[in-house]
């Protein structure tokens, strides 16, 4: 039968704990202390027997970036010289990757209480988002939005570069904030700044500036909407900072909206193990921008 491996992350030099829930059928059952967890090389994982058929594993992060399979094995009841595999999971060892992000309140956009929620999402993938919030009001000159008074959104906003109107918005706001070239910025717009189509936000891949729209219509939009502001902001940071793509663009449209992953269009917030791999891709460089595309 097919067996789907679960994935667990642990930071290099740190400790993580995993609870294994033991389910057994039949009359001949194993004592919990006869179940051994070990690496492929045979190194045993320290465990603690707990109540409710639970074994707690103590996992140590030991590598900069590596993954290994941890096996749960039991002795064969018919041949005690043999071991049987009862289960397994993949353990990912990763080194923390810190990055600086500023949430900017524009025309009253609410950024209060978002930093902790956004940072928590990425910490599970061993990435630290150092979030600064600029709560002082930054007022956009609405004249830059043109005759329709809305921010022009093109197709596939997370993939393309900034258009001329978006560059004008960036240029206007950069002059009104404490801008630092070595930080990423997400502009969180108040209700008077709307896009030309329903969209939760956008941040082109590996670009410095992201845009998030706070109205209920846009937070629940079919495109880039996550239903909650913190999740939408994290989704856009995933695109702009870490070059994460939508899972349905990678694995097929039939899964769109059907996963609990951050980069899907449903309301999930989980980073899957392939996202972890991208977060820690050594070719992924931070704060590398092209001036003409970032509104300079």
Regions found by a protein language model. Name each.
Residues 119-131, 204-215, 237-238:
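Structural alpha-beta junctions
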Residues 176-182, 201-206, 254-257:
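Extracellular/periplasmic catalytic domains that process cell-envelope and extracellular macromolecules
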Residues 37, 70-72, 118, 211-212, ...:
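Generic low-polarity alpha-helical segments
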Residues 190-227:
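Active-site scaffold of zinc-dependent metalloenzymes
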């Amino acid at each position: 039968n097919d067996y789907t491996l679960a994935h667990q992350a642990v930071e290099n030099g740190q400790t993580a704990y995993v609870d294994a829930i033991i389910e057994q059928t039949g009359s001949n059952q194993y004592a919990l202390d006869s179940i051994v967890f070990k690496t492929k090389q045979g190194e045993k994982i320290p465990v603690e027997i707990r109540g409710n058929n639970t074994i707690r594993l103590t996992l140590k992060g030991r590598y900069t970036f590596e993954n290994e399979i941890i096996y749960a094995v039991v002795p064969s009841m018919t041949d005690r010289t043999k071991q049987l595999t009862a289960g397994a999971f993949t353990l990912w060892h990763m080194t923390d990757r810190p990055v600086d992000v500023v949430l900017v309140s524009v025309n009253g956009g609410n950024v209060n209480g978002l930093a902790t929620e956004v940072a928590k999402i990425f910490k599970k993938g061993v990435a630290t988002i150092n979030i600064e919030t600029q709560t002082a009001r930054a007022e956009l000159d609405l004249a830059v939005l043109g005759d329709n008074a809305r921010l022009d959104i093109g197709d596939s906003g997370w993939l393309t570069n900034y258009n001329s109107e978006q560059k004008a918005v960036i240029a206007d706001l950069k002059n009104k904030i404490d801008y630092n070239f070595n930080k990423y910025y997400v502009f969180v717009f108040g209700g008077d700044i709307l896009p030309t189509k329903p969209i939760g936000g956008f941040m082109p891949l590996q670009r410095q500036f992201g845009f998030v729209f706070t109205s209920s219509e846009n937070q629940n939009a079919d495109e880039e909407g996550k239903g909650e502001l913190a999740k939408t902001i994290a989704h856009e940071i995933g695109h702009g900072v870490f070059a994460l793509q939508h899972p349905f663009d990678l694995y097929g449209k039939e899964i769109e909206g059907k996963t609990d992953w951050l980069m899907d269009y449903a309301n999930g917030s989980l980073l899957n193990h392939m996202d972890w791999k991208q977060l820690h891709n050594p070719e992924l460089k931070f704060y590398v921008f092209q001036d003409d595309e970032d509104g300079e």
